[in-house]
């Protein structure tokens, strides 16, 4: 799980750094998960690796801020991807969504994409080292 959930984000950021520095700055957006914030059980490697993404984000933001490189994490809730719907969404899952989320609607990929686009844009120029939670109020 560490290789799947953490390493690629570190190596991608590391590879992008020289070009972003040369360009005078940029934005790196990592992906976390609300699972570690909620203390989900039976997913220890997954939740540990997703918590590590937050630590990595804050460390890189501190190190690279001097080069005007912003580093943030988008933390999605239960997003209704085709895979999620096919493999895990059932009547109990629907009940959990509506019991736990403050906004009583399903979360879809475009909801996450809009946050990523905002973080990539200059509109978020003073945002770095942060977790941006897009979970309809679950956490």
Task: Enumerate the predicted regions with their spans.
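Active-site helix of classical SDR
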Residues: 13, 49, 57
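Alpha-helical segment proximal to the catalytic Tyr-Lys
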Residues: 18, 62-66, 125
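A short hydrophobic alpha-helix cap/turn motif
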Residues: 21-22, 64-66, 79, 120
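Residue(s) in the substrate-gating loop at a strand-loop-helix junction
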Residues: 33
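Active-site loop-to-helix junction immediately N-terminal to the catalytic Tyr of the SDR YXXXK motif
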Residues: 39-47, 59
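A glycine/serine/threonine-rich, flexible loop-to-helix segment
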Residues: 42, 66, 78-101
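C-terminal substrate-recognition "lid" of short-chain dehydrogenase/reductases
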Residues: 106-134, 139
């Amino acid at each position: 799980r560490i290789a799947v959930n953490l390493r690629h984000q570190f190596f991608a950021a590391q590879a992008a750094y020289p070009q972003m520095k040369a360009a005078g700055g940029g934005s790196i957006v990592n992906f976390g998960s609300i699972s570690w914030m909620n203390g989900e059980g039976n997913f220890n490697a997954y939740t540990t690796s997703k918590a590590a993404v937050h630590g990595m984000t804050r460390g890189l933001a501190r190190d690279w801020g001097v080069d005007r490189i912003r580093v943030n994490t988008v933390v999605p809730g239960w997003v209704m991807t085709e895979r999620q719907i096919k493999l895990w969404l059932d009547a109990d899952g629907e009940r959990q969504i509506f019991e736990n989320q403050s906004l009583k609607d399903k979360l879809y990929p475009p909801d996450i994409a809009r946050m990523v686009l905002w973080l990539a844009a200059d509109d978020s120029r003073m945002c770095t080292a942060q977790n941006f939670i897009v979970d309809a109020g679950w956490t």
